[in-house]
Amino acid sequence: MRKFTPKFVPRRKNGPVEEKDVDERVKIEFDVESQKKWKASRPKPEIKLTASGPFALGPNASSSGTGRPIGSVYVPPPNVKNEEKDDALSKLAASSGHDEGHDEDMVDILKLRELNGQEQGKTDIGGKDLLVPIITDRMLPESNDEKLKHHAESAIHTTVINKEDEEQERVALDLQSLAQHLGLTEQEGMEDHFKDQMVLMQFPDKLPRFMGDADVDPVWPSSEVKEEEAGEKTDVEEKKDPDKHGRENGNIDDLTSLPYPAFHPPAGQIGVLRVHQSGKTTLEMGGVNFVVQSGSDCLFLQEIAVVDYDSKRIWNLGSFERRMIVSPDF
C-alpha cells in the first residue's frame, strides 16, 4: 500500500493580495439607512378594547369610580354594534341618584332585577333594602372577638412593661444598698468613712497568760436588798450564781443550744497594738509579739451579736468592715 504524502506548495511572497468577493445582498441587508426606511413604514396596529358593566374600568364603566359619570348615555366605540337591550345598571344609577355616605358603592339588587325584567321568587332574599358592595376601599369594622383580642394583647403588653419597671427599680435599690455597705458611695471625708467601724481580729487557738493586776475571777453581787419603811426589818433574798451551778455540764439552766464559754478573759487591757513607720502592725500581748495582717474579705454577710444566757436575749451590734489575722511573730 502506498503512503500518502502531501505536496509542498511554496508560499507567495510578492504579488497582489487576493480579495474575497463580498455578497451584495448581505451588504444591503445590514445597511443602516435602508433599515430605517422599512422600520418607519411599518404601521402600528390599533388595538380597540371595549368593556361595559359594573366591573368594567375605563370610559365605559358604569360604576361611581373614574370614567363616565352616573346616569350618562352609553356610547359604543366605533365599529362596534350597539346592544339591543338597555343598560339596566345605568338606568338604576340615574333613577336612584348619588347620595353621599356609605351607599356610594352599593347596588340595590331588587331594583336591578325589576329593570332587567327578571321575576322575583326564585331566590328568597331577606330584607327589602339589600345592598351588595361592588368596589370599596374602606376598612371593615372589627368584630367583638377581635376587639377583645386587641384589648387582651394591650393589657398583657402593659403588664409586662410594669413588671420590667418594677424589676429595674428593685435592682437599682439593691445596687445602692450594696454600694453603701461597701463604702463605694461619695463620703464627706475619709475620717467619716472609717469612723465607728468594727474590725474582726482572728487570734490563734492558744493564747499566752495575761499578766497584770486585773482580777481573774471577779466576784459579782449575789444578793439584792429591798428598801422598806424605817423601823422594820430588812429581808435579804439570796440568788444562785449561774457561774457556779452552770459550769458542771457546760450549759446554763435548760439552754442546750447555747454552750457556756470555758475561757474568761480578764477585765481591762490585754495588750498593746503598735503601728510602725514602715506600715507593719504588731500586737504585744502577754509578753509575746504578734503580727497583724489584713485578711481576705468574705462574699457573705457577717454580723456581730452579743448573747445573754440569763435573759435569753441577743443584741445585734452590726457588721464589721475589716478582717485582721493575728499570728505569733517567731
Curated annotation (Swiss-Prot):
This is DNA-directed RNA polymerase III subunit rpc4. Residues 1-14 have a biased composition (Basic residues). It is found in: Cytoplasm; Nucleus. Component of the RNA polymerase III (Pol III) complex consisting of 17 subunits. Keywords: Cytoplasm, DNA-directed RNA polymerase, Nucleus, Transcription. Disulfide bonds: none annotated. Pfam families: RNA_pol_Rpc4 (PF05132). GO terms for biological process: tRNA transcription by RNA polymerase III. DNA-dependent RNA polymerase catalyzes the transcription of DNA into RNA using the four ribonucleoside triphosphates as substrates. Specific peripheric component of RNA polymerase III which synthesizes small RNAs, such as 5S rRNA and tRNAs. Essential for tRNA synthesis. The RPC53/RPC4-RPC37/RPC5 subcomplex is required for terminator recognition and reinitiation. Residues 15-36, 231-250 have a biased composition (Basic and acidic residues). GO terms for cellular component: cytosol; nucleus; RNA polymerase III complex. Residues 1-103, 212-254 are annotated as: Disordered. One of its GO terms (molecular function) is DNA binding.
